[in-house]
Design a protein with these regions (language model features):
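Catalytic-core "active-site belt" of small-molecule-metabolizing enzymes
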Residues: 1-102
Length: 102
């Protein structure tokens, strides 16, 4: 296949204790899931439920790398995310069986 421009490299993250990397295709996020931070940002966790959104896979910044942001930024809020790698799909997975899919 021929592309008009070169496609981006596959986004990936390091795997602790391995030389392999894990490919990242999608990043699903949960907002307002940390109560203290939600309050700090002016939300009421008892009234405002968590919400879901996505980020592009190339939004990943590796450990120790520089976070790119506009030079005129005066109030930068960064977040550290927990990554769960789903190994196999499923539907209506029981709580007891959930970790068998990670």
């Amino acid at each position: 296949m021929s592309y008009a421009i070169s496609p981006a490299e596959q986004s990936s993250v390091a795997i602790e204790g391995s030389e392999d990397r894990f490919p990242v295709r999608r990043i699903y996020c949960v907002g307002r899931n940390y109560r203290a931070h939600a309050i700090e940002m002016g939300a009421d966790p008892d009234r405002d439920p968590p919400f879901f959104f996505m980020k592009p896979a190339d939004a990943i910044v590796e450990n120790g790398a520089t976070i790119p942001y506009p030079s005129q930024t005066s109030n930068l809020h960064h977040e550290i995310e927990l990554v769960v790698a789903i190994d196999k799909g499923g539907k209506d997975i029981s709580l007891e069986d959930a970790l068998n899919h990670v």
